[in-house]
Curated annotation (Swiss-Prot):
Its EC number is 1.8.4.11. InterPro entries: Met_Sox_Rdtase_MsrA_dom, Met_Sox_Rdtase_MsrA_sf. Has an important function as a repair enzyme for proteins that have been inactivated by oxidation. Catalyzes the reversible oxidation-reduction of methionine sulfoxide in proteins to methionine. It comes from Nocardia farcinica (strain IFM 10152). GO terms for biological process: protein modification process. Keywords: Oxidoreductase. It holds the Pfam family PMSR. It is an enzyme of class 1 (oxidoreductase). This is Peptide methionine sulfoxide reductase MsrA.
Length: 170
C-alpha cells in the first residue's frame, strides 16, 4: 500500500457506524469522534453542535470514496433530520464532511443518485459540509461494539440494497 485517503462521515451513533464501516474491503482503520461543532476538545458530555462521526482511513487501490458513500447510505437513514432510530438531536445528524472539492463533488453526485433511486421513502437531508477539526472521542467509545458485541446499535446493512447511477441526460 503506497498511500491512504481519509473520509469523515456522520450518520447517527458512532458505535454502529464504526462497527460496519471497519469491515468494508479497503478500510485500513477507523476512529470515532466529534466534528462540525463549536467547542474545542469536545467530550461525550460536552460537544455542542458537533456530530458523532467516524474518520475512515482507506486504501484507494482497494476501494474508493464513492463505494464508502454508497455503503454509508445503505446502513443509516439519510432522510431523517437530526435522528437515527431512538437517537435524536444534532449529534446524530447525517453529514458528509468533505476534505477536498473532489469529495464534495462525489458526495453531491451520490446524494443525487440516492434521491433518484427511490430506495428511501423521502428526500436525503444529509449535510455536505467542509471538514473541520476532527476530535477523537474518549477511549471507551473506540471500537465499542468489538468490546460489547451485543451493545446498542441502530445501523445495519439493508439486504439487496444496490444504488444505481442516474441516467445521463441528453
Amino acid at each position: 500500500m503506497t498511500d491512504t485517503r481519509r473520509a469523515i462521515l456522520a450518520g447517527g451513533c458512532f458505535w454502529g457506524m464504526q462497527d460496519l464501516i471497519r469491515r468494508q474491503p479497503g478500510v485500513v482503520s477507523t476512529r470515532v469522534g466529534y466534528t462540525g461543532g463549536t467547542n474545542d476538545h469536545p467530550t461525550y458530555r460536552n460537544h455542542p453542535g458537533h456530530a458523532e462521526a467516524v474518520e475512515i482511513v482507506y486504501d484507494p487501490e482497494r476501494t474508493d470514496y464513492r463505494a464508502l458513500l454508497e455503503f454509508f447510505f445503505q446502513i443509516h437513514d439519510p432522510t431523517t433530520k437530526d435522528r437515527q432510530g431512538n437517537d435524536i438531536g444534532t449529534s446524530y445528524r447525517s453529514a458528509i464532511f468533505y476534505l477536498d472539492d473532489e469529495q464534495r463533488r462525489v458526495a453531491e453526485d451520490t446524494i443525487a443518485d440516492v434521491d433518484a433511486s427511490g430506495l428511501w421513502p423521502g428526500k436525503v437531508v444529509t449535510e455536505v459540509t467542509p471538514a473541520s477539526e476532527f476530535w477523537e472521542a474518549e477511549p471507551e467509545h473506540q471500537d465499542y461494539l468489538l468490546r460489547y458485541p451485543n451493545g446498542y446499535t441502530c445501523h445495519y446493512p439493508r439486504p439487496d440494497w444496490k444504488l444505481p447511477k442516474r441516467q445521463a441526460t441528453a
